[in-house]
């Protein structure tokens, strides 16, 4: 399925209108069924969908990890993801229902977001990863080079998992949470250790994005944008280093200063 479509638009430039074709990000509703019970519909970008399903179910505490999942069957034509699981968290099972998560990740997401996050309050990240400012600038440059769909459409979020030397996975989605869930799902499926890795994110570091980073087990998050006050407070509590406004040869470190040299 195409992740970008071409649409006719009227562009106003230099005092006149002209008809052109513009690239637009595809918006795709994916309904997840767990053991034949409808759980949720996520509006997403239609690529790396199995990664999204595994990452979402684990991140939201529906399952404990990929070992609880026997199979994931993605039916693109109908927009269904059918999951067979050998274990489903009983605490979260009561939240099953026809919920709809939009690409803007608004109030509909909160029903899921706060279910399994309370346990994170006292879970501090013990990452030993340290990054130099020069290494951060190089990683961000590579990240930007891997953001072709964003530059083409301006309508997606990008995320990456990286070591101190290289970017390991890059994922993009119209939903900022989805991009991180895709990273999480891929890492879980591959058995990739994350405690010595960092997250690079294209957008604002909100409290939700900070929590996603904590769930991934990463001790550093990097962004071209800024964190919110709540995200900084949570980062200090969870021992996560937040670095924002990475542009050109400057950056701001908001928490976890000892990991950046």
Curated annotation (Swiss-Prot):
Molecular function (Gene Ontology), one example: sulfurtransferase activity
Residues that coordinate or bind Mo-bis(molybdopterin guanine dinucleotide): 245-250
Entry keywords, A to Z: Cytoplasm, Molybdenum cofactor biosynthesis
SUPFAM superfamilies in alphabetical order: Cytidine deaminase-like
An annotated GO BP: Mo-molybdopterin cofactor biosynthetic process
Cystine residue pairs: none
Localization annotation: Cytoplasm
GO cellular component: cytoplasm
Superkingdom of origin organism: Bacteria
Broad class of the protein's primary localization: cytoplasm
Active site: 105 (cysteine persulfide intermediate)
Function summary: Required for formate dehydrogenase (FDH) activity. Acts as a sulfur carrier protein that transfers sulfur from IscS to the molybdenum cofactor prior to its insertion into FDH.
Family named by the database record: Belongs to the FdhD family.
Protein name, as recorded: Sulfur carrier protein FdhD
Chain's gene name: fdhD
């Amino acid at each position: 399925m195409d992740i970008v479509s071409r649409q006719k638009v009227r562009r106003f430039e230099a005092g006149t209108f002209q008809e052109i074709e513009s690239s637009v990000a595809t918006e795709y509703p994916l309904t997840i069924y767990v053991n034949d019970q409808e759980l949720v519909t996520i509006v997403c970008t239609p690529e790396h969908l199995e990664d999204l399903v595994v990452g979402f179910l684990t991140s939201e505490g529906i399952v404990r990890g990929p070992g609880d999942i026997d199979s994931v069957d993605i039916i693109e034509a109908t927009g269904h993801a059918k999951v067979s699981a050998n274990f489903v968290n009983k605490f979260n099972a009561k939240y099953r229902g026809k919920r709809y998560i939009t690409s803007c990740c608004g109030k509909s997401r909160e029903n899921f977001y706060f279910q399994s996050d309370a346990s994170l309050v006292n879970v501090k990240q013990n990452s030993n990863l340290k990054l130099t400012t020069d290494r951060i600038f190089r990683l961000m440059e590579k990240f930007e080079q891997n953001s072709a769909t964003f530059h083409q459409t301006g309508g997606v979020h990008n995320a990456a998992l990286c070591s101190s030397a290289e970017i390991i996975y890059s994922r993009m989605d119209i939903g900022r949470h989805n991009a991180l869930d895709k990273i999480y799902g891929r890492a879980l499926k591959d058995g990739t250790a994350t405690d010595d890795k960092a997250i690079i994110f294209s957008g604002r570091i909100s409290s939700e994005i900070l929590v996603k980073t904590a769930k991934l087990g990463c001790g550093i998050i990097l962004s071209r944008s800024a964190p919110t006050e709540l995200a900084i407070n949570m980062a200090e509590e969870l021992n996560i280093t937040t670095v924002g406004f990475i542009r050109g040869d400057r950056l701001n470190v908001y928490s976890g200063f000892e990991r950046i040299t």
